Structure formats: structure tokens, C-alpha cells
């Protein structure tokens, strides 16, 4: 397991994904943000929605804005819909992915299926 430069707990599971920042050779750099996973339908991909405040000069107030980012979801982290995750910027992994999920900060409560 490598040290990636962030103060987060490494995942308990081990994977052999070469694009994993913990077990592969993917380096992270630049920004890192928190967000909520809104979709996990893609293969090893999640869509993370983050909220931020934008200042409106005319009204001298802030408004809440949202943006969606595609991020790589390694097998050892395995984030699901509703999870609060920390994503970090990295090199372009594909046409739309240049972020990777580094840690799950809070798991979503899921209903038990019977």
C-alpha cells in the first residue's frame, strides 16, 4: 500500500486495479473535493455531485451551485449511490474521467432487501 499524500484512511480491501491510487500506479495531484455519489451505473465509474457557493457581485450575496464530475471508482473502495466521498484530481483516465475516488467518508444508509 502506497502513501498518496492525503490524511485519509486507506481501504481495508486490496485490489489489483492499475488505476487505483492506493494499490496501482496512479498519482494524484491538484485539487480534492468532497461530494455525494449520484450514479454508479458505469463500470468502475461514479458520478459525483459537489455543491459550492458562488458570489454574485450585483446582489452582494452567495448562491449555491452544483456540478457533476465523473470519477474512477477502484474495486477496493467500491462507492455506491448516496455515499459521501473524497475525490482527487489526477491525469486523464478516459475522455470524461480525470478524478479518482480516494475514500468513502460516510456510507449511505441502505434499506435491507428481503
From Swiss-Prot:
GO molecular function, one term: rRNA binding
Cited Pfam families: Ribosomal_S17
Keywords of the record: Ribonucleoprotein, Ribosomal protein, RNA-binding, rRNA-binding
GO cellular component: cytosolic small ribosomal subunit
Superkingdom per UniProt: Archaea
Family matches, as InterPro entries: NA-bd_OB-fold, Ribosomal_uS17, Ribosomal_uS17_arc/euk, Ribosomal_uS17_archaeal, Ribosomal_uS17_CS
Protein's UniProt keywords contain rRNA-binding: yes
GO biological process, one term: translation
Known function: One of the primary rRNA binding proteins, it binds specifically to the 5'-end of 16S ribosomal RNA.
PANTHER family in alphabetical order: 40S RIBOSOMAL PROTEIN S11 FAMILY MEMBER (PTHR10744), 40S RIBOSOMAL PROTEIN S11-RELATED (PTHR10744:SF9)
HAMAP family documented for this protein: Ribosomal_uS17_A (MF_01345_A)
Subunit: Part of the 30S ribosomal subunit.
Stated family: Belongs to the universal ribosomal protein uS17 family.
NCBIfam families: PRK08572.1, uS17_arch
Name this protein carries in UniProt: Small ribosomal subunit protein uS17
Amino acid at each position: 500500500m502506497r502513501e498518496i499524500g492525503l490524511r485519509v484512511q486507506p481501504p481495508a480491501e486490496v485490489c489489483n486495479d492499475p488505476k487505483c491510487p492506493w494499490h496501482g500506479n496512479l498519482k494524484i495531484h491538484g485539487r480534492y473535493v468532497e461530494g455525494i455519489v449520484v450514479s454508479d451505473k458505469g463500470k468502475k465509474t461514479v458520478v459525483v455531485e459537489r455543491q459550492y457557493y458562488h458570489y454574485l457581485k450585483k446582489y452582494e450575496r452567495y448562491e449555491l451551485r452544483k456540478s457533476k464530475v465523473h470519477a474512477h471508482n477502484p474495486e477496493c473502495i467500491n462507492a455506491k449511490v448516496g455515499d459521501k466521498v473524497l475525490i482527487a484530481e489526477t491525469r486523464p483516465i478516459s475522455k470524461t474521467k480525470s478524478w479518482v475516488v480516494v475514500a468513502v467518508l460516510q456510507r449511505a444508509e441502505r434499506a435491507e432487501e428481503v
